[in-house]
Amino acid sequence: MSWQAYVDDHLMCDIDGNRLTAAAILGQDGSVWSQSATFPAFRLEEIAAILKDFDQPGTLAPTGLFLGGTKYMVIQGEAGAVIRGKKGSGGIIVKKTNQALIIGIYDEPLTPGQCNMIVERLGDYLIEQGL
């Protein structure tokens, strides 16, 4: 299966008639493995800051998580595994695997719980596969 199929079929899937606003699978070097057409253009510094928070949990809390110039308030996540951010009625979930970052961006009516499920399910699968 191609990386694009993982994005199209597993991240941008329908959940009760709703779907993520944007999604991507990135290498931990910031390279794009695959992304939805709606995924924002980002700076490598933004990815570096996300990776730093995985290594040193809490570093993004004071400044917020930035992706594509959009600022998300960092909320409860799982240290070293998942970062969650909120902005208005939407937010972002970043799941770290052995080699990649799985990123999902959502807005209402999709709920934070639905976004968590979508992103973390794929991330857990990739971890099981050694990726």
Swiss-Prot record:
Q: Which InterPro entries match?
A: PFN, PFN_euk, PFN_sf, Profilin_CS
| Segments forming a coiled coil | none
Tell me which UniProt keywords the record has, alphabetically.
Actin-binding, Allergen, Cytoplasm, Cytoskeleton
Q: Which family does it belong to?
A: Belongs to the profilin family.
The task this protein performs is described as:
Binds to actin and affects the structure of the cytoskeleton. At high concentrations, profilin prevents the polymerization of actin, whereas it enhances it at low concentrations. By binding to PIP2, it inhibits the formation of IP3 and DG.
Keyword Cytoplasm: yes or no?
yes
Q: Which Pfam families match?
A: Profilin
Q: Where found?
A: Cytoplasm, Cytoskeleton
Q: What is its main location?
A: cytoplasm
Q: Name one GO molecular function term.
A: actin binding
Name listed for the protein in its UniProt record: Profilin
- Report if keyword Protein transport is assigned: no
